[in-house]
Amino acid sequence: MGPDAKKQKLEGVDHLQNGFPVTRFLAWCEKVGLELNPKVYISTEGTVSQYGMLAREDIADGELLFTVPRSAILSQNTTRIQELLEKEQESLQSTSGWVPLLISLLYEATDSSSLWAPYFGLWPELDPPDMPMFWSEEEQTKLLQGTGVLEAIRNDLKNIEEEYNSIVLPFITRNPEKFCPMKHTLDLYKRLVAFVMAYSFQEPLEENDEEDEDEKDILPPMMVPVADLLNHVAHHNAHLEFTPECLRMVTTKSVHAGQELFNTYGEMANWQLLHMYGFAEPHPQNSNETADIQMVTMREAALQAAQTEDDRLEMQKRWDFLCHIEMVGEEGAFVFGLEEVMTEEELKVSLKVLCMSKEEFAEYKENDGWEEDEGDDEQTLMIQEISHLPTPWRKLLHLSAKLTLKNYSTELSMDEALVNNITAYAKLSSREQRSLQVKYGQKRILHQLLELTKS
C-alpha cells in the first residue's frame, strides 16, 4: 500500500496473474460479483509498492475501473458473527471504534472456510505493511526522533494492548466455541490493527447529517477488496465513490497504458503516511507535507523569553487561559503546510495572548477571549504572510521553531546532502529512506519559518 521506490518496470507484469493467490482472488471476485474493467490488472511489477493496479490500455477520465458490491465488503455488518457482535455491542465499545471489525477479522482471517479466505490469501500470514510500530525500539528512536511518528506509535501500541486485554480477550473467553486465546493472540490482534489502519475505508457521512452527528456516530471502518490494492499519491488519478448498492472506483483524469492507478487516502503529510501506511512520498512529490510545532513548545519558548520570575508566572497564567478557552492543549500542535498555516486561529490567538500587554490581557480575559470582529478572521494565513506578523509574534514563533528543530538528531544540511546524492541515498535501507523523507520535508518547512520570522 505504499511507495518505497519504483520497482521494476513493465517487463513481465502479468506473471503474477498466474500466481495462485491472485488467480484464486480474481476467481473469487468474479464469484461475488466484483467486476473489474478489462483495461486494468493487479500486479506487483511496475507498481510503487507491493500490490497495485495498472492500465493495460489507455483509460479515459471518468471511466469506471471496478465495482464492489456491498455484500463483498467485510465489516461488522457482513461477517458471519454479526449477530454475536450485535448481542455483545455494549461490551465492545472502545475509543477507537474498531473493535467489532477487528474481532470480525480475527474470526474470518483464521478460518479457511470464510467467504473472504481468497481475499486474505493475498497476504500470507497476514503480514502487515512495514509500519514503524513493528520496528525495533532502537530503530524507532534512531530514525523517527522529532517527527511525531515515535509518539504516535507508542501511543498506538499502548492503546492496542489495553484494548485487547480489557475488551477483546474477555470477549474471546466468553465465546470459546468460536475463539481461542492461543489462536487469537495479542500479536495477531496487533497485525490486524495494522491491516485495518493500512487497508480499511471509512464511508463518509451524508452531507446533511454532518452537522447533527458527533464523533461517536462516525461510521465504522470496513475492508473493501480490490479498492485496498490501489496505492496512494497526493496527485492521484482515481477515487472511490459510495452508492447504496456498491462502491465504485472511477478515474479522475486520463491514464495511459502501463501507468499505475492511484487512489488517495486524503490530504496526508509524510509523517502520517509513514505512521499509518508504512511509506512516504519522495520529495517534492507530496504537496500535503506539513511540519508541527507542539503547542507546549510555544509555551516553553514563551517561558524562556520571559525576563523575570514574575514574567514567567504571567506567561503561565496566559497559557492556562488559552487552555481554558480550548485554544491550546498539552497534546496539540500548530500545523504548517507548504503554503498555508493549517491551524491559523489557534496560532494567531496564542501569539496574540502570549505577546499582548498586561492591560490588554486583563481586558481580553475579562471578555473570556471575545473581541469585536476584526474582519479577517475567516482569511487563511499563508506561509509567506508570516513575515508581516507583529515583531513580538515573529520572535516567539522563531524561538518555537528553533526549539522544535532541536528535537531532531540530524541537521537539515545533512538530510539535504543525502536526498540529493543518488548513490548515498540508494545505500540507505528502505526504512532509512522513508524516515529521511519525513524529516527532510518537516525541516524544510521549519527552516522556512525561521527565515520568515528572523529579526
UniProtKB/Swiss-Prot annotation:
Keywords: Methyltransferase, Nucleus, S-adenosyl-L-methionine, Transferase. The keyword Transferase applies. Residues 38-266 form the SET domain. GO terms for molecular function: protein-lysine N-methyltransferase activity. It is an enzyme of class 2 (transferase). It is found in: Nucleus. It holds the Pfam family SET. Its main location: nucleus. It comes from the Eukaryota. Its EC number is 2.1.1.-. GO terms for biological process: negative regulation of NF-kappaB transcription factor activity; peptidyl-lysine monomethylation; regulation of inflammatory response. GO terms for cellular component: nucleus. Protein-lysine N-methyltransferase. Belongs to the class V-like SAM-binding methyltransferase superfamily. Histone-lysine methyltransferase family. SETD6 subfamily. This is N-lysine methyltransferase setd6. The lineage of its organism: Eukaryota, Metazoa, Chordata, Craniata, Vertebrata.
